[in-house]
Amino acid sequence: MNFETVIGLEVHVELKTNSKIFSSAPAHFGAEPNTNTTVVDLGMPGVLPVLNKRAVEYGMKAAMAINCEIAEHTKFDRKNYFYPDNPKAYQISQFDKPIGEHGWIEIEVGGKKKKIGITRLHLEEDAGKNTHTSHGYSLVDINRQGTPLIEIVSEPDIRSAEEAYAYLEKLKSIIQYTGVSDVKMEEGSMRCDANISIRPIGQEAFGVKTELKNLNSFNNVRKGIEYEEKRQAEVLLSGGIIEQETRRFEEATGKTSLMRIKEGSDDYRYFPEPDLVDLFIDDAWKERIRAEIPELPDKRQIRYINDLGLPAYDAMVLTLTKEMSDFFEATLAARADAKQASNWLMGEVSAYLNAEQKELNETGLTPENLAGMIKLIEAGTISSKIAKKVFRELAQNGGDAEQVVKDKGLVQISDEGALRTIIGEILDNNEQSITDYKNGKDRAVGFLVGQVMKATKGQANPPMVNKLLLEEMNKR
């Protein structure tokens, strides 16, 4: 029997506000434990929440960016549960009236495009964080408690681990472009739970779903889904039944393990938050927020293809992160050729960032010095090979490309007389290569070009070397 996988993703994104959603405490990552707190975050008796308007507007902006309908009337609710990192014993969330509904985003997998529906986007507060020690007790940090979150719930439209990965990449990119979050999974500002079920191919009814947690990277989401597909199929094929449960992905083993039997919404005893009034959003407010949404990745891709003549693949890679795309735009503003800038950013720059585990803003590279280097290549001042040395110097130490070339003595040798002298010496010492060339062995030319480049420490003008080398050999 063959099965079809059905996946829905729940993505939590921390909003990049200065203060928390219901208190005046700072909402910044990395502070000393339990220092970013107020009596509201600690759940002290008698204190009242105050809604952060910026968090609401960030939620609206994110919802609009993923094509959601914005509610005219929304409200907050209490989600009741007890856990050490939740001092109030309830979480303020949104239950039946979320701020955004009925959205979608488009993904591409294997050259095929597909729309993934968004059920809802709602606002809520984050919980604190427990750190479990090896000494039999846990440490509780309330800093994260009350940080504003949006939860984005997809429709069960995803059919594979690859589609889930593509969905998360696209969602991250869109949210990053809006500026409402930095969406850094390593800092917990983007987190994902996956609801996974399988069903026989052709069956309309959904199977029993498993909720998968502890997915702290996109790769782990993919691995967790792939394992669950296999596990659930083995259970059904052996005559067993799938239990509705919450499971944890174990990164060390690549497997999942039982955490608890899955709760339903009734277990949380939702009821309207009595300390917050309902929120009404008029058209003028919506339009003001809509006007703040920048050009999103899909539209930017189309512009790169149509206006700049870039291949679709280049446009997709360049727009995957806002940082890279903005850097590319600024490099063009510094009058660099679009295709050359694209090639450098997708090639040497990306390779350097991956190897050094850095972001662009953590290097000495700027749009101006990258554009300057590209202009030096186009002018014939440096070769592409020398440009790699210049690039590394700029990335490590910054500065001006032209000045680096002068200081390091990297100017390309394009003087015909100087090159003929060097070529003459090379040919005098490699008469066998001349004979091989005249006998039709083209490899001899490559060898001699290499000798010239070696003698000039890579600074000879390659096209000129090829031209002059052939001329000099044909004279002999």
UniProtKB/Swiss-Prot annotation:
The keyword Nucleotide-binding applies. Signal peptide: none annotated. One of its GO terms (molecular function) is glutaminyl-tRNA synthase (glutamine-hydrolyzing) activity. It catalyses: L-glutamyl-tRNA(Gln) + L-glutamine + ATP + H2O = L-glutaminyl-tRNA(Gln) + L-glutamate + ADP + phosphate + H(+); L-aspartyl-tRNA(Asn) + L-glutamine + ATP + H2O = L-asparaginyl-tRNA(Asn) + L-glutamate + ADP + phosphate + 2 H(+). Keywords: ATP-binding, Ligase, Nucleotide-binding, Protein biosynthesis. Allows the formation of correctly charged Asn-tRNA(Asn) or Gln-tRNA(Gln) through the transamidation of misacylated Asp-tRNA(Asn) or Glu-tRNA(Gln) in organisms which lack either or both of asparaginyl-tRNA or glutaminyl-tRNA synthetases. The reaction takes place in the presence of glutamine and ATP through an activated phospho-Asp-tRNA(Asn) or phospho-Glu-tRNA(Gln). Belongs to the GatB/GatE family. GatB subfamily. HAMAP family: GatB. This is Aspartyl/glutamyl-tRNA(Asn/Gln) amidotransferase subunit B.
